Amino acid sequence: MKTAGKSSLIAIRIVAFFLFVLSPSIFAKDLSGIYKEVIVQDFETDSFGEENIKAKLGPELNPEVRISTVFRTPERDSEKSLYVEVSAERNQSFQILFKKPWTSQEFVKEFSFHMYANEGGGSLFLLVRDSTLDMKKLLLTHFNFSGWKKVSLDISRKVRQDDLVTHKNSELVFLGFLYVAPFEMKRGAREVFVIDDILAKVRPKYLLFPGEKTLVK
């Protein structure tokens, strides 16, 4: 009888495991109402300029980076945005780093960005550091569009947000951006892109089952 009872318990655990793995939509439905939207950066108070740029070439080839009061997303009540202009003569890849990186101990599902572009052909990546302590480069968009556009990036399966050793909550750190220049630009051309309000969908981290040391993702 003990053997039969033990076998039944194992079978129940196996079924429960496969229900969890094969039916993520059930859990997603339960979790959908607990996400909240927070502002990561709205560019209303912080200053941005050459001090935020990290590039391999000399400062004389740095792009123009500044806060703009002219370019503002029509979707939100915005007064300022981050304006970046890259001329053909200064065509190079570079990083735009926050003076104070944004951090979150909550689980971050996605980031959303209100962006303007003039179809310049460059690409923009997010620079984040996850619980592995490695810096990750995540593709946000290719600048193959003109005008304003809301760009969302789901990072829930792209980075680790649980501590692999102690299983405690660990921070996700948003360091800034990496701009990758197009292979070539026509002489006299310029690429302009603007980043306005950056938002994140977050929820608390918690244990999956009592006594378990696995954080829900």
Listing of model-derived features with the role each one plays in the protein:
Residues 10-12, 108:
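Proline-rich low-complexity regions
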Residues 17-20:
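Hydrophobic alpha-helical segments of integral membrane proteins
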Residues 28-217:
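Beta-rich carbohydrate-recognition modules and glycan-binding surfaces
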